Every structure is written in C-alpha cells, then in structure tokens.
Amino acid sequence: MPKHLVFGNEPFLVDKMRNRLRSEVKTPEFNLLETDEFTDVEIRFLNQYPMLGDRKMLIFNAYSMKECEVVVDYLDEMNSDNVHTYLFVDEVDRRTKLFKRFLKGEVEEFNKVSREM
C-alpha cells in the first residue's frame, strides 16, 4: 500500500501539499479521511473499496514519528493499492527504524530556505 511521509519546518509548503492532496480526491465525502488518531474507524476506511473513484486517501496528522508507528505497521500488512496514505508529522527523527522503513520516493520534506550567502 502506498504510504508517504510529509514533514518540514515550512508550514506554508506543508499546508499547500495537504490542500493539493485533498483536491486530487474524487468524491472526497466518500474517499478522503483526515484524522489524528488511528482507531477502528480508520481501519474500516482502509479496508473499504473506493466509491465513485479509483482510490481512497488517508491523511494522518501526527506530532511525532512514534504516533505513526501503529499506522505504518498496519499499512505494511495490508495488500491494497486502492488507498494512498500520507503521514504529516511535525517532528521527525531520521535515525529511527520507522523513518528508514520509508523508501526514498515516499518522503517529502519542506524546509525553509536560508537567506545566508
């Protein structure tokens, strides 16, 4: 199942990415779920087929990578390409095993550009 990690210290660019993702979903009332917790509701959403569209999208907002561990474990066990999951995380530690589970194409980092020359 496609999963992507999105983080950075530039909130404008992170929000722009989040808004772009929202606009890409056909029939968002059925195929888009944005949440900050992972419960039975989110699991049921992930296991349903997309309605009136070709894919579903889960946007998970978290403060730290630790909050994403349960989500990533569940996604790794699923065998479906119908759901794309985007994990928006405020603080990321690149040294963790969890971070290393994401492939190079699955990580989007948005940082402020320094003006020093």
Regions found by a protein language model. Give the residues of each.
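Non-catalytic interfacial helical region
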Residues: 2-117
